[in-house]
Every structure is written in structure tokens, then in C-alpha cells.
């Protein structure tokens, strides 16, 4: 009888353990279906700036390690060749060129993404994710230009477009106000020293870079770029500001601030699914890396900033590993647009470039409709699901919205991500074709099917003298065979009118939507 009872208890315990194990396995499976997601977006870093893409002069071992465990793309694209429209399209899945107010945002610009617009962050939050935005923002704040309450709660802001937590730069490193904004309030602001910002006229008594070069103790501006106004941290910027002395950032600590906040976000949310956008400031101007990177590249501040970016990647990967969630975290590493070497500060970037080619084999760079303007680095890593490799699939950042929604098993609501398409299999390395075509903007519009690229006529300048970049604008139609002429040297429009007509029709159809 006793043995029967024991056997009965044992059977019950075994059944209970089996049920518990089954529940645990179901929970693990459930968690595996909902990976953490990180968008890690560099600033002005080109395809050729990374050693995994062939750089022999700059070594980025952490990015290499990420590429070795994921899919490295050779034909990935941002939607635009500058920051604001690129990030707008990334978050909204909407072509920035459909609106006329998505150009490079001033430091006091109103928020480009309106609260009523669905975003990828909204989608993740609706799926039960905790969402965060850290670092470079450059999408404006408040409801109109100049409408920010810099000394109070700034609204609308990231929380109005899907982000539970935010720690962002108000604009860019070279534009005032040079402060951190955490959850829509300026960090370390002394109420007795309120901030004032203007993009119209200077404040009396506040020194300007153009008048007081002796105060520019760190970097001096290149002529005619506009970086000669308010002086912050020994560097002159675009725009005017006064006050907020206690809240001003130190440029050498920007990467540390962004990285530490990202690591802390990971630590705080390791037990729940999260979506984290990290926008680095590297390698945007002004380039003033932390002392531990200074001189390490042999290429001056820009090269050192690339090493600093690689460090950020390594710290984020390390935080995921320490938290035990690296296996089930999907990381998308990319850049907002192509590279620029001289973008307004006398940091000897051109002089010290040597044999380094930030643009890789492509023509142009930031601001350009040629390939180097929008053909950017991209790596997708998800150790639990993604088989390492290299993909030549044609992919665009605009499709990350719809593709992540597909990953979540959540159909996009009406009006959400109107230009975003589900190419999840391409991002995960399973589909080696990707998109049928990509449409991009930089002064003029272009459309490419991966082999042929058409650039619409434009009255814009063909060459930017200040940045030494070919912009790609021409009054003539342009057609390039990217398979045979990756450097876009020979315009074949006159020789292949039928291909021009085909691609032009695609572009006109997109414009009519």
C-alpha cells in the first residue's frame, strides 16, 4: 500500500514536472518568437569605413564580429543621403520626399514626425515591447519651429511617437542647443540659468566663433560652412544660444553618454522584450573623440571617431552577452547616409585620409544621389535564427518597419508604413533577391533595380565645392549599369532608351501614389 502511494506520488510529481517543463519550453519558444530588437544607426559612416566591407586602413573588430555572426549586405540602402529624411523614413516607412518639410532639420525645428503618424516604435509598443530612443535624433521637437519650451517639458517628442524612454541630442553635434534631452526634459538644467535658442539672431554678449577665434580651443571651423556662431565647449556651432551652462555636453563624452545609456537600458529591460534605437554621433562633425581614442587611427579625429563607433558596438554586444540575451536579440547595424570627409571643421580629415576610401567602390557621398550617398553598411545579426553569410539582396531601410511587423506577426494598420514592404526573409538572409527596386532622394530622385539605375533630371548643382562631393545632379537623364560600372562613370541613357523608359515609369508610378 505504502509503495503504491509512493508510486502514485512519484507519478504525480513526474506529471507535474513534465507539465512544468512543457510550460517552460513553451515560454522559451514564445520568447524566441519575440526577440529583442536593436536598430544601431551610425552617422555619416560610409560603406568603405568598416573593415568588414574591405577597409584596409581602419580596423573595426567589433563590427567584424557582428558581421561574422550575421548577414552582411552589399546592396543595402538608406532612403535619403542626409540625416533627417533618412531617419524619418526609417521610423515611419514613408518616403520623406513625399513631403516638403523633411529636409535637414534645424536645432529648433518642430517635430517632423507628427504624433498621429504610426511608427515602428508604436508597432513594437503595441506588441508589448518596452521601447527606447537613445542618441542622435535630428527629427525636431515640439509642434513648430521655435516652439520648444527648453526649460520645461518639451512636447510633442519621442513619447508621442512610440518611445517609452528617450535620451537624445536635440539636433546634431554641430547645431545648438548642445544639451541632452531625457524623457523630453533637458538634463542637468539649472532653473536659475534658463536656455534660450535662436536661429535668427545672436544674443547680446554671447561670443561667436567668427568674432572670437581665440575661444575656439578645440576645433576651428572650415570657411563658409556656417559653423561660426555660438561657442560651446571650445567649438563653434550653427545657431545661437545662451544659458544652460550646467547642461551643456562635452563633445569628448558624447559617445560614452550614448553608450552608457544604451547599456543601462539593456540591463534594465533584459527580462522583457524591448526595441531600442541607438543613433551614434560618430562620425558626424564636430569630431572630438574621447582621449582614449585620440591618435589611435593615424587619420585624425575622423578616423578616431570610427574606432570610437566600433567601441560602442562592442559595448552593446558585451551588454547583451552579460545579460544572457545576445542569442535572442536581433541587431540591425547601418548608417543614416553615406560618408563626408570635410563637413565644416578644420580637423585635417582630408589631409590625413591617405589611401582610405570611406565611400568604398562607389561614387559620391553624403548629399549625393550617386551610390555612395545612400548605399550604406548594413548587418543583421540574430544568433538564434540568422545563419551567418553575405547577401547581395537589394534591401532598403524603409522596409524595416513592415518587416519587423511581419516578425511580430502583426499586420500593419491602415495608413501605417505606406511605402514599407515586408522583406523579412531578405533581412534574415533567406531571400537573396530582396526588393524589385529602390527609390532614393538627394536633390533629385533615383530608382534602381539592382542592375540599372536611373537618375531623374535636376537643376541642382553637380558638385559641392565645400565638401568636395559629386552630387549627381544633371539636367540630363542618367542611366548606369551598376553590375558593370559600379562607379557610375558612363551614362548609358542615350544607348538604352527602353531601360530609361521602364525605370522612369516606375518612378512616375511611385510619385503618383
What name fits each language-model region?
Residues 2-13, 17-478, 486-512:
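Formylglycine-dependent sulfatase
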